């Protein structure tokens, strides 16, 4: 695996191996007073975020540091990007500065794929076996593969297996890269996926996705093994998608009443940040069925696994 750009690059075996690797890292860190492994000593990981992030950026940073990598955070607002530098020049500059891996978040769909093409082209032209590994940390409304992987890891830990489970994804499907990645990864892992949203928040072509579409949340909750709530991405909207926040919450928010419709074993998830009181009630977000903080913890271990596979390979042992 040279890059991680899309969940569609992973078959069931590859995805399962990453989940297994993440759990091995979790076990390797248990009982250690200092969370530090020498696995990536001497490697340089750079995070390049053109959009704001807390969970993804921090967890990649922690993942790299726990494996002894040198981690450098590049903020678009404080770099030469703010002076008009192109994405290509920024990527090549960071590579020339010694990056072994670039973790990229960008508002344009396909940005990480383009950087990977530039890096692979540079490697061919220079006669090298490869350039830096590229990880897609979110590209516009397209994909967020590591989020889908950590969600799958959380589901596996809570439910025992993903095969045959029903996962209901609720909310702003239209603008959600998390929804897209989850739909395709969960399908690969054998889950049944149901999308619940108002018609205005469904993308064109959603009928071709491996998921069933519904507009009635109450009808879908009793048979769900897991519910993944999505934030309404107001920053990507210009109005007119639904009448009001209150009406949206009434129709598509996960309230205490709706929580009671779920089976006792069902898991409630959210990729964050949560809009408490809109798509999810505080009492639900803080309930025993909620796995929101477990998702964050799993994000570190999963991203350790991704960096390990990209920079070391599957045959090496975890130190």
From Swiss-Prot:
This is Aspartate carbamoyltransferase catalytic subunit. Belongs to the aspartate/ornithine carbamoyltransferase superfamily. ATCase family. NCBIfam families: asp_carb_tr (TIGR00670), PRK00856.1 (NF002032). Keywords: Pyrimidine biosynthesis, Transferase. GO terms for cellular component: cytosol. The keyword rRNA processing does not apply. Its EC number is 2.1.3.2. PROSITE patterns: CARBAMOYLTRANSFERASE. Catalyzes the condensation of carbamoyl phosphate and aspartate to form carbamoyl aspartate and inorganic phosphate, the committed step in the de novo pyrimidine nucleotide biosynthesis pathway. Heterododecamer (2C3:3R2) of six catalytic PyrB chains organized as two trimers (C3), and six regulatory PyrI chains organized as three dimers (R2). One of its GO terms (biological process) is 'de novo' UMP biosynthetic process. It catalyses: carbamoyl phosphate + L-aspartate = N-carbamoyl-L-aspartate + phosphate + H(+). Carbamoyl phosphate binds at residues 55-56, 105, 144, 147, 272-273. L-aspartate binds at residues 83, 177, 231. Pathway: Pyrimidine metabolism; UMP biosynthesis via de novo pathway; (S)-dihydroorotate from bicarbonate: step 2/3. The keyword Manganese does not apply. It holds the Pfam family OTCace. GO terms for molecular function: amino acid binding; aspartate carbamoyltransferase activity. It comes from Nocardia farcinica (strain IFM 10152). InterPro entries: Asp/Orn_carbamoyltranf_P-bd, Asp/Orn_carbamoylTrfase, Asp/Orn_carbamoylTrfase_sf, Asp_carbamoyltransf, Asp_carbamoyltransf_Asp/Orn-bd. HAMAP family: Asp_carb_tr.
């Amino acid at each position: 695996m040279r890059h991680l750009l899309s969940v569609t690059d992973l078959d069931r075996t590859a995805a399962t191996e990453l989940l297994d690797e993440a759990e091995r890292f979790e076990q390797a860190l248990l009982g250690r007073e200092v969370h530090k492994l020498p696995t990536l000593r001497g490697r340089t990981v750079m995070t390049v975020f053109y959009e704001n992030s807390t969970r993804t950026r921090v967890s990649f940073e922690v993942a790299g540091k726990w494996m002894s990598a040198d981690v450098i955070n590049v903020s678009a607002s404080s770099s030469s990007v703010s002076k008009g530098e192109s994405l290509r020049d920024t990527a090549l500059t960071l590579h020339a500065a010694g990056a072994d891996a670039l973790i990229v978040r960008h508002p344009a769909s396909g940005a990480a794929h383009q950087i990977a093409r530039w890096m692979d082209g540079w490697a061919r032209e220079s006669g090298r076996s490869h350039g830096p590994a590229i990880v897609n940390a979110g590209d516009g409304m397209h994909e967020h593969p590591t989020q889908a992987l950590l969600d799958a890891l959380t589901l596996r830990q809570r439910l025992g297996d993903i095969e045959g489970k029903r996962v209901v994804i609720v909310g702003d499907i239209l603008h959600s890269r998390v929804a897209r990645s989850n739909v395709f990864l969960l399908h690969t892992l054998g889950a049944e996926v149901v999308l619940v949203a108002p018609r205005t928040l469904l993308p064109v072509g959603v009928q071709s996705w491996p998921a069933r579409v519904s507009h009635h949340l109450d009808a879908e909750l009793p048979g769900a093994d897991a519910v993944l709530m999505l934030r309404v991405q107001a920053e990507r909207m210009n109005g007119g998608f639904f009448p009001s926040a209150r009406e949206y919450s009434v129709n598509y928010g996960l309230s205490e009443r709706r929580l009671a419709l779920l089976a006792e074993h069902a898991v409630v998830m959210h990729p964050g940040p949560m809009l408490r009181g809109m798509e999810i009630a505080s009492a639900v977000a803080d309930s025993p069925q909620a796995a929101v903080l477990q998702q964050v913890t799993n994000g570190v271990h999963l991203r350790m696994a991704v960096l390990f596979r990209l920079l070391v390979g599957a045959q090496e042992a975890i130190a």
